[in-house]
């Protein structure tokens, strides 16, 4: 019973503290284009307030965005490629 109550308390907190990854977009709905990761790291951390960023498939991919930030809709395959790059 205690475990169940703890689960009910922790689950909403995890949802609130969650971060997301993706191509952060500006007010026009476009993600910044890039050739180098250093530019993307600055763009993602200073403009979009993400944890870090890098260039993935010629657009800036931001890691650790807040849930209220808009991201570009992309295919699952493209997301897997960019998320795999984070691990490597």
UniProtKB/Swiss-Prot annotation:
Gene3D superfamilies: Knottin, scorpion toxin-like (3.30.30.10). Residues 20-83 form the LCN-type CS-alpha/beta domain. Residues 1-18 form the signal peptide. Disulfide bonds join 34-55, 40-60, 44-62, 56-82. The keyword Heme does not apply. It comes from the Eukaryota. It is found in: Secreted. Expressed by the venom gland. InterPro entries: LCN-type_CS_alpha_beta_dom, Scorpion_toxin-like, Scorpion_toxin-like_sf, Scorpion_toxinL/defensin. GO terms for cellular component: extracellular region. Belongs to the long (4 C-C) scorpion toxin superfamily. Sodium channel inhibitor family. Beta subfamily. Excitatory insect toxins induce a spastic paralysis. They bind voltage-independently at site-4 of sodium channels (Nav) and shift the voltage of activation toward more negative potentials thereby affecting sodium channel activation and promoting spontaneous and repetitive firing. Has the structural arrangement of an alpha-helix connected to antiparallel beta-sheets by disulfide bonds (CS-alpha/beta). This is Beta-insect excitatory toxin LqhIT1c. It comes from Leiurus hebraeus.
């Amino acid at each position: 019973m205690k475990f169940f109550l703890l689960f009910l308390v922790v689950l909403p907190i995890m949802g609130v503290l969650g971060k997301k990854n993706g191509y952060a977009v500006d007010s026009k709905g476009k993600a910044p284009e890039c050739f180098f990761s250093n530019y993307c790291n600055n763009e993602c951390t200073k403009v979009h307030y993400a944890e870090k960023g890098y260039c993935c498939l010629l657009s800036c991919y931001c890691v650790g965005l807040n849930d209220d930030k808009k991201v570009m809709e992309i295919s699952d395959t493209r997301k897997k490629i960019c998320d795999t790059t984070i691990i490597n």
